[in-house]
Amino acid sequence: MDLGPGDAAGGGPLAPRPRRRRSLRRLFSRFLLALGSRSRPGDSPPRPQPGHCDGDGEGGFACAPGPVPAAPGSPGEERPPGPQPQLQLPAGDGARPPGAQGLKNHGNTCFMNAVVQCLSNTDLLAEFLALGRYRAAPGRAEVTEQLAALVRALWTREYTPQLSAEFKNAVSKYGSQFQGNSQHDALEFLLWLLDRVHEDLEGSSRGPVSEKLPPEATKTSENCLSPSAQLPLGQSFVQSHFQAQYRSSLTCPHCLKQSNTFDPFLCVSLPIPLRQTRFLSVTLVFPSKSQRFLRVGLAVPILSTVAALRKMVAEEGGVPADEVILVELYPSGFQRSFFDEEDLNTIAEGDNVYAFQVPPSPSQGTLSAHPLGLSASPRLAAREGQRFSLSLHSESKVLILFCNLVGSGQQASRFGPPFLIREDRAVSWAQLQQSILSKVRHLMKSEAPVQNLGSLFSIRVVGLSVACSYLSPKDSRPLCHWAVDRVLHLRRPGGPPHVKLAVEWDSSVKERLFGSLQEERAQDADSVWQQQQAHQQHSCTLDECFQFYTKEEQLAQDDAWKCPHCQVLQQGMVKLSLWTLPDILIIHLKRFCQVGERRNKLSTLVKFPLSGLNMAPHVAQRSTSPEAGLGPWPSWKQPDCLPTSYPLDFLYDLYAVCNHHGNLQGGHYTAYCRNSLDGQWYSYDDSTVEPLREDEVNTRGAYILFYQKRNSIPPWSASSSMRGSTSSSLSDHWLLRLGSHAGSTRGSLLSWSSAPCPSLPQVPDSPIFTNSLCNQEKGGLEPRRLVRGVKGRSISMKAPTTSRAKQGPFKTMPLRWSFGSKEKPPGASVELVEYLESRRRPRSTSQSIVSLLTGTAGEDEKSASPRSNVALPANSEDGGRAIERGPAGVPCPSAQPNHCLAPGNSDGPNTARKLKENAGQDIKLPRKFDLPLTVMPSVEHEKPARPEGQKAMNWKESFQMGSKSSPPSPYMGFSGNSKDSRRGTSELDRPLQGTLTLLRSVFRKKENRRNERAEVSPQVPPVSLVSGGLSPAMDGQAPGSPPALRIPEGLARGLGSRLERDVWSAPSSLRLPRKASRAPRGSALGMSQRTVPGEQASYGTFQRVKYHTLSLGRKKTLPESSF
């Protein structure tokens, strides 16, 4: 692996010649940048991608075809100082961000589209594939390459249906079960796809390391390493981020010895707790005419048969169970009858089930059965058997269920209620017709004639073919038809035998006799509403599913286990738990269950959290000490300065859901995914993409859940710098690297971000903890609460970014990369504190630093006062104005644009001569402390100047009366002992304050000798530093700038002894030209400061205070003697 820029001078074996050339070119390029020149794009060769292999494999993944060069600003890439070019991103359509792109359905491929959308919104996998970070031999990872091309096209908005078709062909080529256009399970395809990606990348990740790296190369930052270098030897990307381990423990109830078994998993399949009963409604048909129909609600057992339902209905009606007939009745007529041995799950919740009570049978004589006995001849016995069968048909009764239909066949529709009659099978057609009319007589019109009308309707036997199931009016005994015999012969145990008949009326006859008679209306009992409410509110939580999944169970007697310690068969206790947790946790809800011989889909609502899923209760307890952790976790997964008991490694956030709509026989798959750019949820239904509210994510169709662990961002990711960062999510997104490739013609993301976005959803609270461990390591600095922001969690859980046009002028600046390191401590700030505490003199400082107090650093700063403080923006509660005071409590009028008065020293003419010679020269600091300063442009010329006389009068009166007001300045100054100013100073100014502290120490030590010389010659009168004689820059002030104010000689002498020490303990007023507009790399809070035209600021004053070092983000009081 190539050495980083910082390791070019390290020892170790010599690199090959191509590497040496590249190192020399990079060194030369850095030298040009250090001189302030900017090389052309063609002068410097593109830096290879981290982990790029130059020949033999180094372990991890194999070389990908056509490696993608590292994007500017990526970890390990040197970034030149100065303004950075605006990064380009694929432009959205104005309404949806990149990544919110649908997929074409190529014929029952909804299962494939839903899984691809969920994986595309998996940030770690999407960045890994889209940026080509995998190392696969060409032609040996076709599925992975096609998936990477498809994911890349979704995020660059270059998707075409041809890409998804090629991906489907690749899947069909290597997975024969997915050939054709059949429906498939989304979970089956997901596991197959992850396994295929693992196989494509596994072979190349087991190669030996070709060369031994020098020790200096092993000390480089983790951000410079590729994903393959971060993975353990022999592990693929899927194993590292998707795979974890189960632990199955078997405990002997006698000796309490435990046997553990560990198994890997890619997905956790959670069973859904089932209710023991379910809701079912049944309509009872009573023989009385006052109340014929009553609909009741029942809680029937799930694992039961129709016999249990028949028993429950008999209890509701108060009749014996063997006198209840259960049938299914729809608007088209009778459908089927239910028998006792049938599974109760064959009756759905919405089926119309009718229960008929058998009418009491009239007293009738016993059938005279002629005993066969022994006969003289077989012929006589046969004739007697035929006579007995004829008497059975002619004299037996049969139960008839009939309903009235208008029309014929399958197009008929029912009117009126169903009826149950008992009729003799030997009756004629006319007798059967009169019996039916007597039952429906009360439904007819009063004036309708029913006598001598001939055949009014046709009768069809239900349950057989329509063509051969009609009874003939010409038959003398129509109930003796073969169709009736067949129905009675096919009956099974459960209720009395019966025949279902459909009485089909002609529409004209029906209108003449019944008018507009419709179906019956059944009255609902109170039990219907009660049972519906009890069963419709059934839901469970995801934690309950985990508890049900990991609960301890005892082995059955047939599955007894022989304990190796007791050597006896024992019914051990089995418990399944999670031993390790993956970065990407995939949870499968088992909605398809096997009940008997039938598989059903469970529509139970499983309530799962969108953020903050705590997996700590479901992880196996370690028997080791708490410091041992959870196993061999990589170092980048462990947060810095966290207590060992803080469960940050157990928190997960949801980012995708795969839904199933329909039943087991057929359905449709959709996906709900959260976009990592705007934080909004979107619904993906093949090619249709629509925004989704957060309260609509949790549905009864949720099938597969995708969770990502918080802070599980590897150092090779573009988002690795977002830990502890407060910049926007756009500046840290990996898509910036993809959009910054050479030759990219895609538009900027700002065109999409300027579109109006919906309101910000509620982001889960960030964990707040005390960094006590850091305080102990840093020398006992004052403890300060550290709040991990939104960047601390997964990038897909960031809050949606609002419109750029509505965020003010500060948000319209070009996007910048965050240089905050994930694991590297702020080295520059620590070195600065150590340097100040050591009281050492800076190197390479051969000239006097006092000249900078009276001169300016450039031509654009002539209007600045020699003793004015460096401009610092402050945001205070009272509108951004801070009260300033002069030296030793001398006030500065708030209405004055002049600078505060600074007493002079008594160095005499020699000092004045040196100040003139050294005016305008920059201070030379050691390279170690060459920190950038924030240069704020002066806007004094934009302010209308007031009359000079009025200025001098106000200042003189204020100085004599000791007013507490301070002169306003174009920039806000830093006040050491002002509470408002201290509260108003933002964290962005801390690197600058650290630089001022350094300059104060250098300035103080440099001028100590001059104070001694001044004490030897007290006859030299003190000279004001603001007098024009000492500062040649003051003579050439810009027009419109206020004149320098002079102090009377007596007043200066009176204040000299009292204010002499205050001058040297005050902050330096240097204004050095900065080389870069960015903060130090080591500081996590260092950010470039921008000034909006029209913003007011002021120059600070000198005060006697105890200054603090804020470069580390913490306040530490330093004694004045150190300055």
Swiss-Prot record:
Q: Which of the residues bear the PTM Asymmetric dimethylarginine?
A: 746
Q: Quote one Gene Ontology molecular function term.
A: ISG15-specific peptidase activity
Where is there biased composition of kind Basic and acidic residues? 979-990
Question: A GO biological process this protein is involved in?
Answer: protein deubiquitination
Q: Which InterPro entries match?
A: Papain-like_cys_pep_sf, Peptidase_C19_UCH, Ub_carboxyl-term_hydrolase, USP_CS, USP_dom
Compositional bias (Low complexity): 29-39, 1016-1027
Q: Which UniProt keywords apply?
A: Hydrolase, Methylation, Phosphoprotein, Protease, Thiol protease, Ubl conjugation pathway
Q: Where is the USP domain?
A: 101-710
Q: What class of enzyme is it?
A: hydrolase
Coiled coil regions in record: none
| Family label | Belongs to the peptidase C19 family.
Q: Name one GO cellular component term.
A: nucleoplasm
The answer to whether UniProt assigns keyword Iron to this entry is: no
Name the catalysed reactions: Thiol-dependent hydrolysis of ester, thioester, amide, peptide and isopeptide bonds formed by the C-terminal Gly of ubiquitin (a 76-residue protein attached to proteins as an intracellular targeting signal)
Region of interest (Disordered), ranges: 1-102, 202-221, 795-826, 854-886, 959-1049, 1068-1099
List the EC numbers from the record.
3.4.19.12
Provide the function of this protein: May recognize and hydrolyze the peptide bond at the C-terminal Gly of ubiquitin. Involved in the processing of poly-ubiquitin precursors as well as that of ubiquitinated proteins.
> Which species does the entry assign this protein to?
Homo sapiens
Q: Does the keyword Lipid metabolism apply?
A: no
This protein is called Ubiquitin carboxyl-terminal hydrolase 43
- The annotated regions of Basic residues compositional bias extend over 17-28
Gene3D superfamilies per UniProt: Cysteine proteinases (3.90.70.10)
Phosphoserine modifications at: 969, 1041
Q: Its gene?
A: USP43
Q: Where is the active site?
A: 110 (nucleophile), 668 (proton acceptor)
Q: Which PROSITE patterns match?
A: USP_1, USP_2, USP_3
Write out the tissue specificity statement of the associated record. Expressed in brain, aorta and lung at low levels.
